[in-house]
């Protein structure tokens, strides 16, 4: 790199770092939005600044108040132009949006980035689809355990996990198991197959558990399936379960069945939760 190029790069970095006012931000995006080499250096400086904080609260404050307002306009500029290349500041914005629990923007950007086959930045031992799936899974597990609604984020991500994204089998299996558990929750958040009167919901839960078992035989779904079968038998005795109308299920199985994921999502989004302590299956 010649002296003139070096000076130009240093000036560009200075301008990118001085984006506290919106007009300066717009100018920086317009001037340097295509200069990925400069943006990459500026990005690494900001990532290092985040890592330098000693407390999680300080890191979150910086991500929310400094990093994201600075870098999201560059992300929007990148997406608007339509060119596709490995873009680390796009991926870091997704990561930090999840960190501050801005799931609407995080998922919106993540879906676009995954369609572009974006990779995680160097040093990350995961893929972007697996990262996003884990983020929403962990949040869902914690939120549902508190008896609170997990929609729309769970269903939005579940459809991608089940039908679109390439994930490790263990990750997909735990998502299928969680979806089955959510189907069996009461409005108060208690997971209890014996409290479900809709045979179709029980059949779907069994199908999800069996698919999870087929992907990972250590998924731990046997008990849930047995409880669902017991409830279906009780409904059949009372005349509330017509085995000829619904797909036949007979407990833990390696037989693959077509799962209506749209119906799963429809039932999940139609059953809001209320605050309560979690029960057992």
UniProtKB/Swiss-Prot annotation:
Superkingdom: Viruses
Keywords: DNA-binding, Endonuclease, Hydrolase, Nuclease, Viral genome packaging, Viral release from host cell
Family annotation (InterPro entries): Phage_P2_GpM (IPR010270)
Covalent S-S links between cysteines: none
GO biological process, one term: viral capsid assembly
An example molecular function term from Gene Ontology annotations: DNA binding
Family according to the record: To phage P2 protein M.
Protein name according to UniProt: Probable terminase, endonuclease subunit
Species of the source: Haemophilus phage HP1 (strain HP1c1) (Bacteriophage HP1)
